[in-house]
Amino acid sequence: MATLFIADLHLCAEEPAITAGFLRFLAREARKADALYILGDLFEAWIGDDDPNPLHRQMAAAIKAVSDSGVPCYFIHGNRDFLLGKRFARESGMTLLPEEKVLELYGRRVLIMHGDTLCTDDIGYQAFRAKVHKPWLQTLFLALPLFVRKRIAARMRANSKEANSSKSLAIMDVNQNAVVSAMEKHQVQWLIHGHTHRPAVHELIANQQPAFRVVLGAWHTEGSMVKVTADDVELIHFPF
């Protein structure tokens, strides 16, 4: 058996091929897993659990079917869907996890997260993140009419796209000191995360020992998952 990790699907109505690929993944690979962990940015945007978007209802039902089959499903918020709440988690049968979580997997201690908190060189983004994660601001936003939230979210996405276009690739990647600090704080030799869309297995030193950082790929033209078994930790890409 295996534990599976995915991230950065950025599901939206404009990308039906990705949605179809995810549904096939849930019907096949996910059903055979010990557990499924979704490490953020499952959706391209999330403006509240009360959004009647048909895609959200479809995904909730599909994930719930996996959960009901006996495969536990877990979710860590990403930078796109950090407002996903308890209502959707309940509808989809997912358990919401904190932004950093340590798992005991087949004899390994593994730290999992979305990954945006590791990009400490992107000072502008980190300031924005700190602001939008304030509970009072989230409560205020979610109290707004749905059409107002949609307009605000569209404007924020446009601003983010414009800002990122002028940033260097290095700034938007993880900071190595932040990586080592997180791994040493949690006393782990394995870290799995998404966010950067740069799939790879990196070797480093943490806790004065060899360590590994596994980065999930985004679901653009193919699927990406990390498969952890008693024997191995694999980064796997597969066609939709």
From Swiss-Prot:
Pathway entry: Glycolipid biosynthesis; lipid IV(A) biosynthesis; lipid IV(A) from (3R)-3-hydroxytetradecanoyl-[acyl-carrier-protein] and UDP-N-acetyl-alpha-D-glucosamine: step 4/6
Reactions this protein catalyses: UDP-2-N,3-O-bis[(3R)-3-hydroxytetradecanoyl]-alpha-D-glucosamine + H2O = 2-N,3-O-bis[(3R)-3-hydroxytetradecanoyl]-alpha-D-glucosaminyl 1-phosphate + UMP + 2 H(+)
Pfam families linked: Metallophos
Residues binding substrate: N79, R80, D122, S160, N164, K167, H195
Cofactor requirements of the protein: Mn(2+)
Record's cofactor remark: Binds 2 Mn(2+) ions per subunit in a binuclear metal center.
Enzyme Commission numbers on file: 3.6.1.54
Membrane-related topology note: Peripheral membrane protein
Record-listed Mn(2+) 2 binding positions: D41, N79, H114, H195
GO cellular component: cytoplasm; extrinsic component of plasma membrane
A single BP term in Gene Ontology: lipid A biosynthetic process
Membrane in keyword set: yes
Leader peptide range in chain numbering: none
Localisation per UniProt entry: Cell inner membrane
Transmembrane segments: none
SUPFAM superfamilies: Metallo-dependent phosphatases
Alphabetical keyword list: Cell inner membrane, Cell membrane, Hydrolase, Lipid A biosynthesis, Lipid biosynthesis, Lipid metabolism, Manganese, Membrane, Metal-binding
Alphabetized GO MF terms: manganese ion binding; UDP-2,3-diacylglucosamine hydrolase activity
Binding of Mn(2+) 1, residues: D8, H10, D41, H197
Keyword Ribosomal protein annotated: no
InterPro entries named in the record: Calcineurin-like_PHP_ApaH, LpxH-like, Metallo-depent_PP-like, UDP-diacylglucosamine_Hdrlase
Record's function text: Hydrolyzes the pyrophosphate bond of UDP-2,3-diacylglucosamine to yield 2,3-diacylglucosamine 1-phosphate (lipid X) and UMP by catalyzing the attack of water at the alpha-P atom. Involved in the biosynthesis of lipid A, a phosphorylated glycolipid that anchors the lipopolysaccharide to the outer membrane of the cell.
Family under the similarity heading: Belongs to the LpxH family.
Protein name: UDP-2,3-diacylglucosamine hydrolase
The organism of origin for this protein: Escherichia coli O7:K1 (strain IAI39 / ExPEC)
